[in-house]
């Protein structure tokens, strides 16, 4: 091969020589490819013709065979981006680099997330490439206080704005002369006075625009800095030209536009300051999550209690937590009992009772007892750290709805410069032939009114605020893509056990005396069956003392038989009683039928061959399940239940909560196929489950929603995780998605509408440059401000007919 490139890929999933041979054979079947796969190093070295192939093709081939290619992810902090054209250009350049699988750049967070192949490139190369484009970049430091960094940057912007405003304010007086025919001191109209004030604004305060424009143009791009630099420079240097004419006596009334250039820069800085201030508020939800973390822990060392920083706690350390203190890390209680406020995770305000061997979650509040615990998860592995990670990823991700804005942003500035040039030509040749000033003013107005910033901020700011607000309510979206897809859902499939129900059987009905219950619980206490556990717990709640069984025998399909303290015990169904010649009174038979119809497991109890009781056990429906399903129906969403239980039990549960569609007798591996059937009917389906035995169905659904327990926030199969198991959060998640997408559409409508309307108005000469500059400055502020309205949204779904 004359023109060749070589790449090395890390391969995962190979177990033997057959694997490596299979991959090598498949790659070598491609034209102009020479591949060698080493099982020991788990690497594939591929020589290829870059005109015919790219690395992604080899990766797809390997993945199609069922193997993986190792990918690393790095997050980068980027400074110097001023508008969507900047972020769009950086993203485009990164995605063209060898070894980069995918790169996204977020203008709002000023961060990039890059997935890359470590054998092809590394984080330092990514940083260097961004720096060559004229921006500052560094690998994100998770230990660095991002809030204080942004506060410092905001303070710097404010200082520049104040200096610029002080210098521009006297020049602003000249505009009032033109507008209102006011009388002002002669000093204000003196060209030297205007020059002295405008020059530092143009070349010191406004130098950032020249630097940004130069860096972008040098790299073949154009951004907002180009528009500002060209527009203000045109006004400034035309004023210099007029001033020179005044100095050499060619004119006594120079037409100066120093106030235009200086006031434009001040207004744009004002807009950027307001924008940065508003953007800083979009990350409040993340800041609040970070503030929940404990700062230190009380560790037990050599019998002494010592306070240490949280980052020095290791797995296995013994910690002591006193009343009123936060649980420092995730762990297990080894001594003591208490009640813990877990509302930061579950939203449930009632403290949860905790005893020895119970799990405790870091950053929750210990209310009333001193406990000793063992650390099981620390640092980035804790539940709160996982929540923060999910929220960060969601806030830095892109929604598909942003693509159009990204495409337009890439061409926006060159098009605007072209329109400004055309405006100048039309004015100087057709509108006011031979008159320079009106043509200049109109073209400057076109340059400064155009705003690519609003386009770039329209989607990410809404995603940031929307996902942050959802996280505050225990709803974790894994990314912007899932926020967008969720609003399209028209069908929700709920797994029964652990989703609609509590997943823990309890005694719902009992008819009999305490002695019968005591004997029943004693007979069941050694069984590991969940129903037996429910009966034993019920007896303990009644404070009954359990003894020991003398004999025990399971009767397959019918029940159990036992001897306790010389009493013969039978527990089971009708058949067991009939086989032992025990007759059922009509009211007992009716109760049995009633319980079975309600989906409960009913058992008859006979002591010494005489019927003495009946007990019913069922997995109870969660609080608010019925209300949640009613809300989904009110939103026009179809709700179905999927379960492996028999149809009678399933129908009984469905009836309790108001579900019409029941899919019963389904094996776990068949759940995904049921989702596919619904999708084939043209439905957009969300699957709700616990992420364990229904993971394939969660993946298959358009949106997978996992019910987390607080410690399981990163369930891989899920697109959304609901903390705490409250089903009311499902309609809230859908409403949050709808509200966020509605907000994005409002922002995009404003951003597009503003430019579509504003540029022609400016080109017609109907706007003074300073008015156009003010409009441009406020346009991006209005987009961010509109997104911030989501911070106050009440997650209460609307009826479809409302």
Curated annotation (Swiss-Prot):
It comes from Staphylococcus aureus (strain MRSA252). One of its GO terms (molecular function) is ATP hydrolysis activity. It comes from the Bacteria. This is Copper-exporting P-type ATPase. Residues 5-70, 72-138 form the HMA domain. Its EC number is 7.2.2.8. CDD domains: HMA, P-type_ATPase_Cu-like. Cu(+) 1 binds at residues 16, 19. SUPFAM superfamilies: Calcium ATPase, transduction domain A (SSF81653), Calcium ATPase, transmembrane domain M (SSF81665), HAD-like (SSF56784), HMA, heavy metal-associated domain (SSF55008). It is found in: Cell membrane. InterPro entries: ATPase_P-typ_cyto_dom_N, ATPase_P-typ_P_site, ATPase_P-typ_TM_dom_sf, ATPase_P-typ_transduc_dom_A_sf, HAD-like_sf, HAD_sf, Heavy-metal-associated_CS, HMA_Cu_ion-bd. Belongs to the cation transport ATPase (P-type) (TC 3.A.3) family. Type IB subfamily. Mg(2+) binds at residues 690, 694. Its main location: membrane. Keywords: ATP-binding, Cell membrane, Copper, Copper transport, Ion transport, Magnesium, Membrane, Metal-binding, Nucleotide-binding, Phosphoprotein, Repeat, Translocase, Transmembrane, Transmembrane helix, Transport. GO terms for biological process: copper ion homeostasis. The active site is at 495 (4-aspartylphosphate intermediate). It catalyses: Cu(+)(in) + ATP + H2O = Cu(+)(out) + ADP + phosphate + H(+). Involved in copper export. GO terms for cellular component: plasma membrane. It is an enzyme of class 7 (translocase). The chain crosses the membrane at residues 161-181, 192-212, 224-244, 256-276, 411-431, 438-458, 748-767, 771-790.
């Amino acid at each position: 091969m004359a023109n060749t490139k070589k790449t090395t890929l890390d391969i995962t999933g190979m177990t033997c020589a057959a694997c490596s041979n299979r991959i090598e054979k498949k790659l070598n079947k491609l034209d102009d490819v020479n591949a060698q796969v080493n099982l020991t190093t788990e690497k594939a070295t591929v020589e290829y013709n870059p005109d015919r192939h790219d690395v992604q093709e080899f990766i797809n081939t390997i993945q199609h065979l069922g193997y993986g290619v190792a990918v690393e992810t790095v997050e980068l902090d980027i400074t110097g981006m001023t508008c969507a054209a900047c972020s769009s250009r950086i993203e485009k350049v990164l995605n063209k680099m060898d070894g980069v699988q995918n790169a996204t750049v977020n203008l709002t967070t000023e961060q990039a997330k890059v997935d890359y192949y470590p054998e092809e490139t590394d984080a330092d190369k990514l940083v260097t490439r961004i720096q060559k484009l004229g921006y500052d970049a560094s690998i994100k430091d998770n230990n660095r206080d991002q809030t204080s960094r942004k506060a410092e940057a905001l303070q710097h912007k404010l200082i520049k704005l104040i200096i610029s405003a002080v210098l521009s304010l006297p020049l602003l007086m000249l505009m009032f002369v033109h507008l209102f025919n006011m009388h002002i001191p002669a000093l204000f109209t003196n060209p030297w006075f205007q020059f002295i004030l405008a020059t530092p604004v143009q070349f010191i305060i406004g130098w950032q625009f020249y630097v940004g424009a130069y860096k972008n143009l040098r790299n073949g791009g154009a951004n907002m800095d180009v528009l500002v630099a060209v527009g203000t420079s045109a006004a400034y240097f035309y004023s210099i030209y007029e001033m020179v004419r005044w100095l050499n006596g060619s004119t006594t009334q120079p037409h100066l536009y120093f106030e235009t250039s200086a006031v434009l820069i001040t207004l744009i800085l004002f807009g950027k300051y307001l924008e940065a201030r508003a953007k800083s508020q979009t990350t409040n939800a993340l800041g609040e999550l970070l503030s929940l973390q404990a700062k230190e822990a009380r560790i037990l060392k050599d019998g002494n209690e010592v306070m240490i920083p949280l980052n020095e706690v290791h797995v296995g350390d013994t910690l002591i937590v006193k009343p009123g203190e936060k649980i420092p890390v995730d762990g297990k209680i080894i001594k003591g009992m208490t009640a813990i406020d877990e509302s930061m995770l579950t939203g449930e305000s009632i403290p949860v009772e905790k005893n020895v061997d119970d799990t405790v979650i870091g950053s929750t509040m210990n209310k009333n007892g001193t406990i000793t615990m063992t650390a099981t998860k620390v640092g980035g592995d804790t539940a709160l750290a996982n929540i923060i990670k999910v929220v960060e990823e969601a806030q830095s991700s892109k929604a598909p709805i942003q693509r159009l804005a990204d495409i337009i942003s890439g061409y926006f500035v060159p098009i605007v410069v072209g329109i400004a040039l055309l405006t100048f030509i039309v004015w100087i040749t057709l509108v006011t032939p031979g008159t320079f000033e009106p043509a200049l003013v109109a073209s400057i107005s076109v340059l400064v009114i155009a705003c690519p910033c609003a386009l770039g901020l329209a989607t990410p700011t809404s995603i940031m605020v929307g996902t942050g607000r959802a996280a505050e309510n225990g709803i974790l979206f894994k990314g912007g893509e899932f926020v967008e897809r969720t609003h399209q859902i028209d069908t929700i499939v709920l797994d029964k056990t652990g989703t609609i129900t509590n997943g823990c059987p309890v005694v719902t009905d009992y008819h009999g005396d305490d002695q019968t219950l005591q004997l029943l619980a004693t007979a069941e206490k050694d069984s590991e069956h969940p129903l037996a556990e429910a009966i034993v717990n019920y007896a303990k709640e009644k404070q009954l003392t359990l003894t020991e069984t003398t004999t025990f025998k399971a009767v397959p399909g019918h029940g159990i038989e036992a001897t306790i303290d010389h009493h013969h015990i039978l527990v089971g169904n009708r058949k067991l009683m009939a086989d032992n010649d025990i007759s059922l009174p009509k009211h007992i038979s009716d109760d049995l039928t009633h319980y079975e119809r309600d989906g409960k497991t009913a058992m008859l109890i006979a002591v010494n061959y005489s019927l003495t009781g009946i007990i019913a056990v069922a997995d109870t429906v969660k609080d608010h399940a019925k209300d949640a399903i009613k809300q989904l129906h009110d939103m026009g969403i179809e709700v179905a239940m999927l379960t492996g239980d028999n149809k009678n039990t399933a129908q009984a549960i469905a009836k309790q909560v108001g579900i019409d569609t029941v899919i019963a007798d389904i094996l776990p591996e068949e759940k995904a196929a049921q989702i596919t059937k619904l999708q084939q009917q043209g439905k957009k389906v969300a699957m709700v489950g616990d992420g364990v035995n229904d993971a394939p169905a969660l993946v298959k659904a358009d949106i997978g929603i996992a019910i987390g327990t607080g410690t399981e926030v990163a369930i891989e199969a899920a697109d959304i995780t609901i903390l705490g198991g409250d089903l009311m959060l499902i309609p809230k998640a859908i409403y949050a998605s709808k509200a966020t997408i509605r907000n994005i559409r409002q922002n995009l409508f404003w951003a597009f509408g503003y430019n579509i309307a504003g540029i022609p108005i400016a080109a017609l000469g109907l706007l003074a440059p300073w008015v156009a500059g003010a409009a441009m400055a406020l346009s991006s502020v209005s987009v961010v401000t509109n997104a911030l309205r989501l911070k106050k949204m009440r997650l209460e779904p609307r009826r479809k007919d409302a």
